[in-house]
Amino acid sequence: MNYRMQIQYDGARYRGWQRQAATGDTIQGKLEAILTRRFGRNIEIDGASRTDAGVHALAQIANFHVADDEAVEPEELQKYINQYLPEDIAVTGVVAAGERFHSRLNATGKTYEYHLIPYGTYDVFVRKYAWQMTEPLDIEAMREAAGHVLGS
């Protein structure tokens, strides 16, 4: 059985998505530990994308396999995982996927958003999720730079 999960997380406290030998403070590491406990054996998750330390995700897609005789209802699995996750990580959906589905290899697109607080303005409610500009943007320089990567 292959499960597809949709996950959202506030990455501020984590060292990124990818499991690291030296720390359990990764999103993948947290999820794999819960699934390993649930199934009583090592479960490895494949994510659609790796995020860096401090980066958040609204709809990260991941998948993992279990033997058919270990399969449980997706809704039951989602509830189980969320019960053990910290409050800054949530599995927002679990479905049974085709055996050949792979979250990274079958991804058809990714969207990255960068939030900026303009120079001279302040917003205490988004400060954790946006970069405070320390000087005005040079729009003309940005247009010129974008011309070098357009279409690549």
Each model region followed by its residue ranges:
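Structured-RNA-binding interfaces characteristic of tRNA pseudouridine synthases
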Residues: 1-152
